[in-house]
Amino acid sequence: MSSLFRKKPLETLSAQSKSKSLARTLSAFDLTLLGIGCVIGTGIFVITGTVAATGAGPALIISFILAGLACALAAFCYAEFSSSIPISGSVYSYSYVTLGELLAFLIGWDLMLEYVIALSAVATGWSSYFQSLLAGFNLHIPAALTGAPGSMAGAVFNLPAAVIILLITAIVSRGVKESTRFNNVIVLMKIAIILLFIIVGIGYVKPDNWSPFMPFGMKGVILSAATVFFAYLGFDAVSNASEEVKNPQKNMPVGIISALAVCTVLYIAVSLVLTGMMPYAKLNVGDPVSFALKFVGQDAVAGIISVGAIIGITTVMLALLYAQVRLTFAMSRDGLLPGLFAKVHPSFKTPFRNTWLTGIVAAGIAGFINLGTLAHLVNMGTLAAFTVISIAVIVLRKKHPEIKASFRVPFVPVVPIISAGICLWFMYSLPGVTWLSFVIWIAVGTLVYFLYSRKHSLLNK
């Protein structure tokens, strides 16, 4: 039984972090944009209006502040680990050195499902926006190629979703420098489009629309904070980049915390302007930002925002694929997954085969499977990871006080305990079918560990 809780030696992690198999090219600026790219998708254009109309009213800005603070607690934990143990694998690698092999494998197994389902689900959303854009030009894809079987009448394969994943795969496989350049350009365009809405919309703000400010009471604000919490998920993907970052001890914490801070400011600003442009009760529509712009006669800007939604989703897919590949790379290097996933291309300095295998699987899922309620597993997986890393910080401080970190979580163990408690509360609020799917996936992972990973682990040698 003791082998189930064997821990990876810090010396091994230190040696791996100094390995030159992956190229160190990322700066704090690159990391910040990677995090923003993964967090801000279509949610900022959709969830702001919907939650304002049904849960919080103009006080939605307070909901976003509360949710941002809750996410910050977990972000602090990621920042401390990434500055003290700058290695690929994120919470998998961090829990391996603090909580033991079995739990590390299971949280890695959990994140594998989270990333691939999120990637496929986001690609499906991209497909819908892309088809709507084509329809505006009176162009239409054959019905059989517009969705997965069961998603709509006559659909057999979601071609746009599969194609966009394969295009993103081609970019990511060519090298971190190339994919970073692409991500930076697209994220800056996305931020520019959001700022365009804020600048144009602020001219139409009527303070009377902010009254009553809290129509659903404080209870509505808190419940809405639980809803918008999920709009922040994705910043953890940054921690998978540690081995490709210049001066990771300094730049990793800056990238993680800066990404979360920028996203929080943008969410608050959009919420403030949106609820000021028109009565909050009218915002319960599928595209509230575009709807509000049309409401004030800014149809052209509304069209630009629709294009911005497509751009926004693209960077989310890139960040998710990047995180998935770096996670399986780390697990394979430790012997817990087959060696194929850890092979690095001699020219591109990327896990080339791993990237394409992941991309093809995700494209197949997006093309053929109607994800439905499985999309909730993304939230479950992320919250489980947040809980584990919060606990792991406490263990790290107690078991390895000698580790020097450029960023340290304040008020340990109080902050990590609060972080874990909030995440467990959010997990409890998820549907029963999500819990059932999660338990089944973890059970499958346990079998894989005992049948393969335990025997092939490098710690056996």
From Swiss-Prot:
<feature type="transmembrane region" description="Helical">
    <location>
        <begin position="56"/>
        <end position="76"/>
    </location>
</feature>
<dbReference type="Pfam" id="PF13520">
    <property type="entry name" value="AA_permease_2"/>
</dbReference>
<dbReference type="InterPro" id="IPR002293">
    <property type="entry name" value="AA/rel_permease1"/>
</dbReference>
<keyword id="KW-1133">Transmembrane helix</keyword>
<keyword id="KW-0813">Transport</keyword>
<feature type="transmembrane region" description="Helical">
    <location>
        <begin position="213"/>
        <end position="233"/>
    </location>
</feature>
<feature type="transmembrane region" description="Helical">
    <location>
        <begin position="301"/>
        <end position="321"/>
    </location>
</feature>
<comment type="function">
    <text>Involved in import of methylthioribose (MTR) into the cell.</text>
</comment>
<feature type="transmembrane region" description="Helical">
    <location>
        <begin position="409"/>
        <end position="429"/>
    </location>
</feature>
<keyword id="KW-1003">Cell membrane</keyword>
<feature type="transmembrane region" description="Helical">
    <location>
        <begin position="376"/>
        <end position="396"/>
    </location>
</feature>
<dbReference type="GO" id="GO:0005886">
    <property type="term" value="C:plasma membrane"/>
</dbReference>
<feature type="transmembrane region" description="Helical">
    <location>
        <begin position="152"/>
        <end position="172"/>
    </location>
</feature>
<feature type="transmembrane region" description="Helical">
    <location>
        <begin position="33"/>
        <end position="53"/>
    </location>
</feature>
<keyword id="KW-0812">Transmembrane</keyword>
<feature type="transmembrane region" description="Helical">
    <location>
        <begin position="355"/>
        <end position="375"/>
    </location>
</feature>
<dbReference type="GO" id="GO:0006865">
    <property type="term" value="P:amino acid transport"/>
</dbReference>
<protein>
    <recommendedName>
        <fullName>Methylthioribose transporter</fullName>
    </recommendedName>
</protein>
<feature type="transmembrane region" description="Helical">
    <location>
        <begin position="102"/>
        <end position="122"/>
    </location>
</feature>
<keyword id="KW-0762">Sugar transport</keyword>
<comment type="similarity">
    <text>Belongs to the amino acid-polyamine-organocation (APC) superfamily.</text>
</comment>
<keyword id="KW-0472">Membrane</keyword>
<dbReference type="GO" id="GO:0015171">
    <property type="term" value="F:amino acid transmembrane transporter activity"/>
</dbReference>
<feature type="transmembrane region" description="Helical">
    <location>
        <begin position="254"/>
        <end position="274"/>
    </location>
</feature>
<feature type="transmembrane region" description="Helical">
    <location>
        <begin position="432"/>
        <end position="452"/>
    </location>
</feature>
<feature type="transmembrane region" description="Helical">
    <location>
        <begin position="185"/>
        <end position="205"/>
    </location>
</feature>
